[in-house]
A protein has these predicted regions:
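ABC-family ATPase nucleotide-binding domain "signature/switch" substructure
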Residues: 409, 414, 425, 444-445, ...
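ABC ATPase nucleotide-binding domain helical subdomain, centered on the C-loop/LSGGQ "ABC signature"
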Residues: 390, 398, 423-464, 517, ...
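Helix-to-loop junction immediately C-terminal to a conserved catalytic motif
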Residues: 379
Length: 570
């Protein structure tokens, strides 16, 4: 539970002391008032509070009023502290989890299931909030109960100890039920994560559902997910809900046992017995709260444990950040670079090559051949399993990741936009990027004329799915985003694969203009995209099968030659 409670022992301790003080005030009030009631019945002016200490009836009433005021004040303070404690813990946990994820390496992030982060930040964190509330309630109730029991023992030791012993004995009978609550909590946590990831996957098929008319089948799949998750939640809630009724039944049996014990011991102090029974009945409510808190913690703990595991995984997966400045990127060299995923599946085998400064290089090859992995290595998203990658003769793994990200940028095949304006999407949270730099990047990407035609200009709102922009405009916006910090190496993945003729022409024009100022690497399946390349490399089965000029490669490499033929370019 360290992710939620951590080093907050001082706050919990303050709540415990406050609850103990509140419990003592309540216990003393119950003793004084119960004995005052017996004094009125017996028509006496003096009452015994604890031991031989006596008070007048009026004094007892004043003490009772004082105890009410003290208890109310302490309870209000505890409520304020508890609510502040709970909300701050949840907020801090969400910040910590989000930061750990965002700074985790790309391989760690990519290994997450769809919707996992959202589920951790919502359902799992809310369960953590419930756990924190349960812990604070349990601590408060426990110390209030201790205060009440202490007062009861001081008033009538025999009856109080009998009740306490019976309550502990009966309470131990609930241990198997609490274990069942925890097991069902684990099942519910796993079901919730599966529901979130599966639903996220389905939600991404919106267009396909309409195209293939599979709404009924998708609805059935969602229904199965809902039913499975609901069943797990129902079993957990049932196990939680029966803890308190069972405890109450056992506690009442303990009170009956106490009466029997007092009768056997021939206790004759009726006033003391009445005070003890009143305290014990009040203590029963605290006992119920403790049992309720315990079962709630048992149900929420699996969620919190899973959240802690993921948080530790994100932190452990934080990518190493070199300290050396990048300086000039220059030539990019790969020396015997190999890469294997965690399942030991090798996707690149001893790739060696050099991409010269201001050279335009194409990458082609069959799907699954290793092109995407090679690009991720160049971007610094992954580190080679063997070999090295050098920029201007220096290992990029030793360089600052932040500076490398400004010098080496990427345009993905699919545009990813955020809710905001056109300017917001070009800037993309980089607060140091000026409006002048944004306008310059838009001109380089041949997007400025389109923006000028918008009534709102750069303030035109753009949805996360690209609303208000065509596909070509979205792609050019992503190109402007990549150019806004004046990179030295630009990598593009299928930049024109799904564009109209005009947008494709504009992007090709941009690349021709940029080739005079920076190194460009283009991953492409469409051979027409590569006619601006100085050299082209062929990646097949994780190996570099060819790296030469287009004319030489068409004669020496069978894959490239066949691709040109199939494209009608040869």
């Amino acid at each position: 539970m360290k992710v939620f409670l951590g080093a907050r022992g001082r706050t919990i301790g303050a709540l415990a002391l406050t609850s103990f003080g509140s419990g003592m005030a309540e216990a003393l009030f119950l003793v004084v008032i119960s004995r005052a009631a017996f004094a009125v019945t017996d028509d006496v002016d003096q009452i015994r509070v604890i031991g031989d200490r006596s008070l007048s009836l009026g004094g007892a009433i004043l003490i009772g009023l004082s105890m009410i005021a003290i208890r109310c004040g302490l309870a209000l303070w505890a409520a304020a502290q508890s609510s502040r404690f709970s909300t701050s813990v949840v907020a801090d946990t969400r910040r910590t989890l989000a930061e750990a994820f965002l700074f985790a390496s790309w391989p760690v992030q990519q290994s997450d299931r769809s919707g996992q982060l959202q589920e951790l930040l919502t359902t799992f964190t809310n369960q953590g909030s419930q756990l924190v509330n349960s812990v604070t309630l349990g601590v408060s109730s426990t110390f209030s109960l201790i205060a009440l029991l202490g007062m009861a023992v001081a008033v009538n030791p025999v009856g109080s100890l009998v009740v306490l012993a019976a309550a502990l004995a009966f309470g131990s009978l609930l241990r198997p039920l609490r274990s069942a609550v925890r097991r069902r909590g684990t099942t519910a946590a796993n079901a919730g994560m599966h529901f979130a990831s599966s639903l996220t996957s389905l939600s991404q098929l919106g267009q396909e559902m309409h195209i293939f008319r599979i709404q009924k089948q998708a609805t059935s799949a969602v229904d199965e997910l809902v039913t499975s998750s609901a069943d797990a939640e129902r079993r957990l809630l049932f196990a939680r809900s029966i803890v308190v009724p069972l405890y109450s039944t056992l506690a009442y049996l303990a009170l009956i046992g106490a009466l029997a014990g007092i009768t056997i011991s021939n206790a004759t102090n009726v006033a003391a017995l009445g005070a003890v029974m009143l305290i014990m009945l009040r203590a029963l409510s605290y006992g119920q709260a403790i049992q309720n808190a315990h079962s709630s913690v048992a149900g929420s703990l699996p969620f919190v444990e899973r959240l802690q595991v993921e948080l530790d995984r994100y932190r452990a997966g934080r990518q190493y950040d070199g300290q050396q400045p990048v300086g000039h990127v220059g030539d990019l060299t790969l020396n015997d670079v190999s890469f294997s995923y965690e399942d030991e599946r090798r996707v690149l085998h001893e790739v060696s090559l050099t991409i010269h400064h201001k050279e335009v290089v194409g990458i082609v090859g069959p799907s699954g051949g290793g092109k995407s992995t090679l690009v991720q290595l160049m971007l610094g998203l992954r580190d080679p399993s063997a070999g090295s990658i050098l920029a201007a003769g220096r290992p990029i793994i030793e360089m600052s990741r932040d500076e490398w990200a400004r010098k080496v940028t990427f345009v993905p095949q699919e545009a990813h936009l955020v809710a905001g304006t056109v300017a917001d999407n070009i800037r993309l949270f980089r607060d140091d990027v000026s409006m002048e730099a944004i306008e310059r990047a838009a001109r380089l990407a041949h997007l400025s004329d389109d923006i000028a035609s918008f009534p709102e200009g750069y303030d035109r709102p753009v949805g996360e799915l690209g609303g208000h922009l065509s596909g070509g405009q979205q792609q050019r916006l992503c190109l402007a985003r990549a150019l806004v910090e004046r990179p030295e190496l630009l990598i593009l993945d299928e930049p024109t694969s799904s564009l109209d003729v005009r947008s494709e022409h504009l992007i090709r024009q941009t690349l021709v203009e940029l080739s005079k100022h920076m190194t460009i690497v283009i991953v492409a399946h469409r051979m027409s995209t590569l006619d601006i390349c100085d050299r082209i490399m062929v990646i097949q089965e994780g190996r570099l099968k060819g790296f030469d000029t287009p004319s030489q490669l068409s004669e020496s490499n069978a894959f490239y030659s066949e691709a040109l033929t199939l494209s009608g370019l040869k």
